[in-house]
């Protein structure tokens, strides 16, 4: 927690491998680790839900969840996206975080809170052991904040560690 400009988001971007750290050490499960890029962070079980969401509004919920890692299947001599598997798995992950949205819905039709829920489901689908939430309530209504907190409590009860960044003392 800290005021605007205190470096909270910068620190999280260092942990996630977006920025290079000049000093300090990071330990994960008691082991010193160096994370040079987001792929390494994901490989080590860290996921981040950024304050500035970067959805692709023209694509479906499922396509946004699986961007860059689409499930594939063989179609003759080539690999093609396995849409059926992608939609089924997306429905499972969304249900897992208690947000049963339609995986085929265009993300651009959803509220900011729903888009954040999709990002959290994406983090869970990556088998993240640590989820960094960077000011997730900054543009949410009170009802949307409560829905987000339900997701956070559920993840915590499952043993997922959460790093929650905020400048709001009440959170």
Segments predicted by a language model, with ranges:
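Glycine-rich phosphate-binding loops of nucleotide-dependent enzymes
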Residues: 1-171
């Amino acid at each position: 927690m800290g005021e605007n400009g205190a470096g909270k988001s910068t620190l999280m971007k260092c942990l996630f491998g977006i920025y290079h750290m000049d000093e300090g050490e990071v330990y994960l499960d008691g082991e010193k680790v160096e994370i040079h890029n987001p792929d390494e962070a994901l490989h080590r079980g860290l996921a981040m839900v950024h304050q500035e969401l970067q959805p692709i509004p023209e694509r479906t919920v499922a396509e946004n969840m699986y961007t860059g890692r689409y499930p594939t299947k063989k179609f003759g001599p080539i690999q093609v996206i396995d849409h059926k598997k992608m939609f089924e798995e997306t429905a499972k992950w969304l249900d897992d975080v208690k947000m049963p949205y339609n995986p085929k819905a265009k993300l651009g039709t959803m509220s900011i809170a729903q888009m954040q829920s999709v990002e959290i489901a994406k983090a869970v689908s990556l088998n993240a052991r640590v989820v960094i939430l960077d000011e997730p309530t900054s543009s949410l209504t009170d009802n949307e904040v409560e829905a987000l907190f339900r997701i956070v409590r559920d993840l915590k009860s499952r043993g997922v560690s959460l790093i929650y960044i905020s400048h709001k003392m009440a959170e």
